[in-house]
Amino acid sequence: MTKQKKFITCDGNQAAAHISYMFSEVAAIYPITPSSTMAEYVDEWAAAGRKNIFGETVLVQEMQSEGGAAGAVHGSLQAGALTTTYTASQGLLLMIPNMYKIAGEFLPCVFHVSARTLASHALCIFGDHQDVMSARQTGLSLIHISEPTRPY
């Protein structure tokens, strides 16, 4: 007997949160629009005791800033945990110093980035790739997707 597949309707943030939850042991989060919902889903699932593919509940650490989240990612990776975080725009810029360290130490991690315009005098919230392109010199591999449900 074959098992029925379960399909759900979701947006890109939920799809990315689902796949990252399944393959992570630690998630260092700090909410920043438009990536906040990814962190919220992961936090909700961990609080409910949902198991990942390793049969464990993901340890979610909400930090005081994006820089703190990047530092927590680096420390967790150093300890050997599969770690992820979620960010956008200025938050990603604050993570760049730790991204250099992570890349230089060849540590495997995933930064889920909801690409957004860097805030200027007009505080624009439209999508572009200024934030992601500012991190391209760190040595981390960048993978871009053209539609929001591709992570799943």
Q: Which role fits each region the language model picked out?
A:
Residues 135-142:
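Acidic/polar active-site rim loop that often engages polyanionic ligands
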Residues 1-135:
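Thiamine diphosphate
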Residues 143-152:
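Single conserved hydrophobic/aromatic residue that forms the stacking wall/gate
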